[in-house]
Swiss-Prot record:
One of its GO terms (cellular component) is small ribosomal subunit. It comes from Chlamydia muridarum (strain MoPn / Nigg). The gene is rpsM. GO terms for biological process: translation. Residues 94-122 are annotated as: Disordered. This is Small ribosomal subunit protein uS13. It holds the Pfam family Ribosomal_S13. Part of the 30S ribosomal subunit. Forms a loose heterodimer with protein S19. Forms two bridges to the 50S subunit in the 70S ribosome. Signal peptide: none annotated. GO terms for molecular function: rRNA binding; structural constituent of ribosome; tRNA binding. Keywords: Ribonucleoprotein, Ribosomal protein, RNA-binding, rRNA-binding, tRNA-binding. HAMAP family: Ribosomal_uS13. Residues 101-122 have a biased composition (Basic residues). Located at the top of the head of the 30S subunit, it contacts several helices of the 16S rRNA. In the 70S ribosome it contacts the 23S rRNA (bridge B1a) and protein L5 of the 50S subunit (bridge B1b), connecting the 2 subunits; these bridges are implicated in subunit movement. Contacts the tRNAs in the A and P-sites.
């Protein structure tokens, strides 16, 4: 398993798929990185040379925000929204859907387990 920026990527998978195991790199960004470094997109991750792994590490550390840095940035953005009392921040604080989804029904994942309330007596 090649180790890229501290992450073990699967050796038997093609390079395009292996790179997506790094947080912050999806299929499109993976293709872009492979093209920039002029690597063989059909090659398996295990076939990378030490020099290619070094170039990949250098590129990811210098030009892209991935893994821990990206996670910290997302968390700080959410914290900032909460402190400035933005609507999105309040939704995050209350653990409700942030992007305008309905909450009368659905949104169970975000709200948690259903709390039963006694019905009105007739």
């Amino acid at each position: 398993m090649p180790r890229i920026i501290g992450i073990d990527i699967p050796a038997k998978k093609k390079l395009k798929i292996s790179l997506t195991y790094i947080y912050g790199i999806g299929p499109a960004l993976s293709e872009e990185i492979i093209a920039r470094l002029q690597l063989n997109p059909e090659a398996r991750a295990a076939e990378l040379t030490e020099e290619e792994v070094g170039r990949l590490n250098a590129l990811l550390q210098s030009d892209y925000v991935v893994e821990g840095d990206l996670r910290r940035r997302v968390q700080s953005d959410i914290k900032r929204l909460i402190t400035i009392h933005a609507y999105r921040g309040q939704r995050h604080r209350l653990s409700l859907p942030v992007r305008g989804q309905r909450t009368k029904t659905n949104s169970r994942t975000r709200k948690g387990k259903r709390k039963t309330v006694a019905g009105k007596k007739k």
